Each structure stands twice: as structure tokens, then as C-alpha cells.
């Protein structure tokens, strides 16, 4: 793929100005944050994911995993199984500064899903697509509608052209349809572990093919933050109560354990019980608010 002749993904420091990040989302549709996650966080997260990868797949119905080819491994629900994700990555202040600005027209937001994909050698490139398959409503939004979904891509191994770094078509969030783009319209999101790729709703992108013949698979965790007006793809309501109460208030909000507030004219919120706040009815404690 020839990438030198076209504008590339902007790469920002993790402490860059949030207004600049949001401008890039509106102008380009995506950008990379360099070194957002420290090495020890990435290392801890990878160890926890190694444990999950070693568990034999459950018997019975697997609605999504069974649709993947054999050289594509999938681990769902990392918010429940990986403490590093739910207690550190999920509440990262930079990610939430971006989300608060990004979702300001639609109100509160929460996590829709977070799962691991491990892509081994021989996996072909994905077709170009938008991240709207879980909630087809997004496909019918007019271009001028405020965004209601944000994709956050965490590389946990190196992303290179050879092992299938994500391919992003800058500015494609302004297209009316995905169509059939050529691969050379995209730019490569080559990244190191700890970097993060932030992708605006409607941006056309694809995972590249893994053309390596040896070495580790490409490992990535995909997290999707949606307006609370959309039902999450994964539910976290089956998490043990003691696990939930070990989290911060923000973490609990992201996983649907507290009442949330869309934008006006909604005046009371959603996720209510008997016209009361969910957390009050449950008498829910939190790590940063025990009483």
C-alpha cells in the first residue's frame, strides 16, 4: 500500500488539547493518541487476556465467535474478566475528556462493548465498513445528526502493515454510503502497544490482512462507547455485586449500573427503577463513594 502521497493520521501526545482532538474527529474522522496506556498497564492487561485465551470455548451457542474464521480468535466481555480494563483503562481521564466533548449534544454515554480480537497469520483483510452493524439505526442517521457512537481501538501488540494494521479512510464520515472503496484510499494506523486509535462514527475502515509467516498474532481490544440512548451490545448486569462495588462511580456508570441522563428534553434520565435512581434503589457502593 502506498501511503506517502496522501494526508496521514494525526498522532497526538496523550496530553494534547482535547479541543484539537475533537476538531480532528470532525475534520479527519480519526486520530492516534501516542502512549496513552503505560507499559505496566498494557503488560497487566495482556496477562489477564492470556488467561482468558487459555480457557476452552464454552459449549453451546456462540452468536458471534462461531462466525469468525479459525485464524481469528475472539474473547468477549473483557470488562468483567479483566480487572485492568474495568479499573484502569475504562476510566482513563483522557478517553472521558474526549467522550464528554464528543457526546455533548446527546448527553451521557456508556460502554456498548469491549472485546479482544487476535488475528493470526493468514487472516485476509476485512471489507471496508462502518461500525454500525450492532445498531442499524446509525445507518439511517443524516450526515448532520450528532454522533452517537465512538470506537476506541487498543493495540496490545505492534500494528504494522505486514500484520494487518487498521486501514482508515480519512474524511469518509462525510460519505453518504460506504460504496466499494479501493485499498489505496486508506491510510495505515501503524501503532505500538499503549497507543490508541480513536475513530468517529461513520468513518469507513477495515482491519488489514495478516501477511506475516511467523511471530505473535496481532492482538487488539475494541471498545465502543455509545450514547445512553442506545442499548449496549454487551450487558454487564450479571457482574457480581462485590465486583461492581469495587469499581469507581464512573466505571459503574459505563457498565450500566447507574441512572444516566440523555440530553434535554429528557428531564429525569433513563435506567430507572420505580421512578427512582437505580443506584439509590440498589444502595450501591463504589470504590470512590463507599457511603
Curated annotation (Swiss-Prot):
It catalyses: fumitremorgin B + 2-oxoglutarate + AH2 + 2 O2 = verruculogen + succinate + A + CO2 + H2O. One of its GO terms (biological process) is verruculogen biosynthetic process. The active site is at 68. It comes from the Eukaryota. InterPro entries: Phytyl_CoA_dOase-like. Keywords: Alkaloid metabolism, Dioxygenase, Iron, Oxidoreductase, Virulence. Its cofactor is Fe cation. GO terms for molecular function: dioxygenase activity. It holds the Pfam family PhyH. Coiled coil: none annotated. Pathway: Mycotoxin biosynthesis. Its EC number is 1.14.11.38. Belongs to the PhyH family. Verruculogen synthase; part of the gene cluster that mediates the biosynthesis of fumitremorgins, indole alkaloids that carry not only intriguing chemical structures, but also interesting biological and pharmacological activities. The biosynthesis of fumitremorgin-type alkaloids begins by condensation of the two amino acids L-tryptophan and L-proline to brevianamide F, catalyzed by the non-ribosomal peptide synthetase ftmA. Brevianamide F is then prenylated by the prenyltransferase ftmPT1/ftmB in the presence of dimethylallyl diphosphate, resulting in the formation of tryprostatin B. Homodimer. This is Verruculogen synthase. It comes from Aspergillus fumigatus.
